[in-house]
Amino acid sequence: NLLRFDFAIFENEKLVYLIEYQGEQHYTPYHFDTQEKFEKRLEYDNAKKEYCKQNRIPLIIIPYTDFNKIDIQYLNKKYQEVKNI
């Protein structure tokens, strides 16, 4: 399956890192008809994390609870946390 990420950050045409904004549906099953669909969502999220890990691509995951905190300093801090993965 094709893995889609919310944002890709490039510098000089080189991928620097990926960003995933994770809404509430990534944490609680109430957005889904069945538990199985929720578990598929979690599997898809884990596939993205594993892809980035295997390909040494830094992945910033922003939980919906941080929505009002997002600014350039927030992103820089998150990048510093993941850049050497």
Label each residue range with its predicted role.
Residues N1-I85:
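Nucleic-acid endo/exonuclease domains
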